[in-house]
Regions:
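Bacterial N-terminal signal peptides
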Residues: 5-16
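Short inter-helical turns and helix N-cap capping residues of alpha-solenoid HEAT/ARM repeat scaffolds
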Residues: 45-46, 77-78, 109-110
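Eukaryotic acidic, Ser/Thr-rich intrinsically disordered low-complexity regions
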Residues: 117-144
Length: 144
């Protein structure tokens, strides 16, 4: 009996999460209060909070966070936090953000951080090339 109840609960949970992820209007508006809270979190002394804020700023592609994230990438002593900042900069994707990631490949003292930055920059360039190839294909097909 316990086995059947467990299977039922797991199936219900699976169905709920499947339908919950299909909501296209999950995040439609990002309030200024949210952005300022995340940017303030970058100045916290709590390492976990800083990492989480950097991650969310990247996920939300908040371009006003580029300068504080660049500062973390250049100056912070913690490798994990610098990697989180580099990932956020990669996700934001502005030319200034991508350039900061590119420069960290050459100038960061940590080989681990440099390798992660190289991976992020490689993905950026690969996606850029794919987009250019798609555009070229569309132009060529439209001219036929």
């Amino acid at each position: 009996m316990k086995f059947l109840v467990t299977i039922f609960l797991l199936t219900s949970l699976l169905i709920e999460t499947s339908y919950a992820s299909g909501n296209p209007k999950a995040i439609t508006e990002i309030r200024q209060n949210t952005i300022s809270s995340l940017e303030n979190g970058l100045n916290s002394k709590n390492l976990g909070l800083k990492s989480s804020c950097a991650y969310m700023l990247g996920e939300l592609r908040i371009s006003t966070a580029v300068i504080p994230l660049m500062k973390i990438l250049r100056e912070n002593e913690n490798e994990d936090l610098r990697i989180a900042a580099a990932l956020a900069l990669y996700k934001i994707g502005t030319p200034m953000a991508i350039n900061a990631v590119k420069q960290s490949i050459r100038f960061d003292n940590s080989e681990r951080v440099s390798k992660h930055c190289a991976s992020f920059y490689y993905e950026h360039m690969k996606n850029k090339l794919i987009d250019e190839e798609k555009n070229d294909y569309v132009v060529k097909t439209a001219r036929k």
